[in-house]
């Protein structure tokens, strides 16, 4: 990210939560796309939950972005959509008439604590990766995993 000045969106089929990838599969199908790629972030401060769920025990970094700079940059990227995730119970999802354009930003209520922000690339091509330029000044802070081995 620092050397290439890019962030990478990947195929959600690799996600653990198959409900999330299912919503994106439906979105892709309904929009007649070949692929929808995504990157998930959080608006929440660094927590134990994030380190324990999204990294292996000793690996990983936490990158804090300047929200306004990141959003302004994403707004200038052709074909990119982004926004906060909306959380709903499965019962509410069944009862509400959900607009197809909401699907990339919809998640089960049980995950509300994640306060997720998503960057989405709907593609008419069958690609597995989408790199987006990233201005380095949008990065405010980088933290190393607290369980990373100590240097010698």
Regions found by a protein language model. Give the residues of each.
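Partner-binding and oligomerization surfaces adjacent to conserved cores of proteins
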Residues: 1-152
């Amino acid at each position: 990210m620092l050397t290439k000045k890019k962030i990478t969106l990947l195929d959600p089929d690799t996600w653990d939560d198959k409900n999330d990838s299912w919503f994106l599969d439906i979105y892709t199908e309904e929009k007649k796309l070949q692929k929808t790629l995504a990157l998930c972030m959080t608006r929440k401060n660094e927590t134990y939950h994030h380190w324990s769920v999204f990294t292996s025990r000793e690996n990983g970094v936490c990158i804090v972005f300047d929200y306004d700079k990141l959003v302004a940059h994403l707004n200038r990227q052709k074909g990119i959509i982004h926004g906060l995730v909306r959380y709903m119970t499965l019962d509410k999802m069944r009862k509400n008439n959900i607009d197809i354009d909401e699907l990339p930003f919809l998640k089960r209520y049980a995950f509300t604590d994640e306060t997720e922000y998503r960057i989405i690339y709907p593609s008419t091509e069958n690609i597995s990766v989408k790199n987006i330029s990233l201005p380095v000044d949008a990065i405010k802070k980088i933290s190393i995993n607290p369980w990373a081995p100590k240097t010698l």
